[in-house]
Each structure stands twice: as C-alpha cells, then as structure tokens.
Amino acid sequence: MKKIIPKIMIFIMFLAGLSLLLYPLVSNEWNTYRQEQLISSYDSQVAQKTEAGEIDYTAQWDAARAYNEELLPSILPDSFAIAAASEEPDETYMSCLNLNGDGMMGYVAIPKIDIKIPVYHTVKDEVLEKAAGHLEGSSLPAGGGSTHSVISAHRGLPSAALFTDLDKLKEGDHFLLYILDDILCYEVDKISVVEPDDTKDLEVEEGKDLVTLLTCTPYGVNSHRLLVRGHRVPYEEEVMEDTPKSLITGTSLHTSYLLWVVVGLSVTALFILLLYLYEKKKRNQKKHKREQ
C-alpha cells in the first residue's frame, strides 16, 4: 500500500499539471466555437427575417441614426474602467440594433488576423469576458457622416483570444462590421497607443464615418490602450477575399499556448521517465542485495 500511494500522488499531480496546461487552449477553442455558433445564428436570423418580411430594417437603421444625431459631444470614459459598473444602460440605446433582444448588435470581422467576434451593447464585464462590446456614449455602428463608434474587447484572456492580435494590423488593412442586413467596411488609417484616460482620439470628426477598435496594451501589462481607427470605404467582396489571412509576425495566442502545452508535456514525460528509471534502479539494487 505504501508503494502505491506515491504513484497515485504522482498521477494526480500529472493530471493537475496537464489540466492547467490544456485549460487555456481548450477554453479558447470552446469560446471560438461558441462565437461561431452565435454568429451563424445571427446570420440565419437576419436571412429568415428578411425573407419573411418580419422586420423593417429601414426603421431599425433610422432609429440608430436618429440616436447618433441626438448624442451630445462628451468625454468618453475608459471602457475597461467602467466594465464593472452596475448602472443600467439607457433603454433607447439598448433598443437600437438589437435584432433578437439579446443585446447582440452584430459582429466584427478582421480578415488580416482571421477573426470574427460578436459585438454586444455595453462594455460590461459579462460582455467583455466572451465578446466585444460597444462603448455606450460613442456613436452606434450604423454608419453615416459625423459618427465615431468604439468597439472594445480584451486582449490575452486565457479563455478567449478576442483582440489579442489586434496589434498586428497596419494602416491600409480592413475590418468589417456585419450589422443587421448590411456590411460596413472600414480601412485602418490611424493606429495609436494612449493613456487609459486619454480619449480625444475617440471624438467625432465632422463629416467622417469612423470606427475605432480598442483594447489594452502592452500584452500582459495593460497599462495603456491600443486604438485602431478606420474610416468607411465601399465594401468590395473581392478585395476582402484576397486579403491575406493570419499573415502576422510573432506568435498568436493559440500557437503560444500550444507551444507551452508541448513543452509542458515533454517536461512532464521526461520527469516520469527519470522517476521510473530511478525506481527501477532502486529495485535492482535491492534485488542484488538479496541475492548476495
């Protein structure tokens, strides 16, 4: 019995270590799957409602643009600083671009880094843990002149990649917003790193249709904010299809965790092998003594 207990403990430690190593990878894959399901469901709902004539998209767009016109110029807060706020969002705001009543406005697609992420109303913790959020107080992502919408998401979460590779975008790259029955295309024209409370780059500019993707930086430190701004350009499907995917320098979150898993398993296997050889050597020594 005394010989069995250490072996059981070693096995338990091995499983615990393996679980810790695999958690980020498995969790990220699960969240990616969930995001794909949500996006697929959203697209299906849009198609079904369009075919059945169940919804007046013109009225939806008009309501969103009317909301944007009524927005007063104001200093926007840091989205991550207000994520835990308990205040309920404005009812008018929540009713706009809310196709299924679940708060999902649509989704953002970034061909360069090969991601599609659902976009929800608000930047509350429960939103940012699983998807991207629209910063209330900024323009709704409905297009039009003199608007500036802000879409925020975390970077480097163990459970989801989200905007982890946002820093790989360059000026001239494109990102898309799939909102209701339309696709809004934006070309990156400005990338900046600012202090969390420096939000002047998020202000509306007269006549311009702008969207900024916002996340924390540097990776793992999160002391500043990375702003990737784009201006509206015509959507051309051929251009998007020709955009190179995942042509990024450095190691992505998925690859990084996979590397750590391989290294961790190799070290664990080596440890078990050495332990086995040590135990075998001890048994041989005892056997040799008994034979003498």
Where are these regions (language model features)?
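Generic N-terminal leader/processing signal
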Residues: 1, 5, 285-287
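Solvent-exposed, non-transmembrane regions of membrane-associated and secreted proteins
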Residues: 3-253
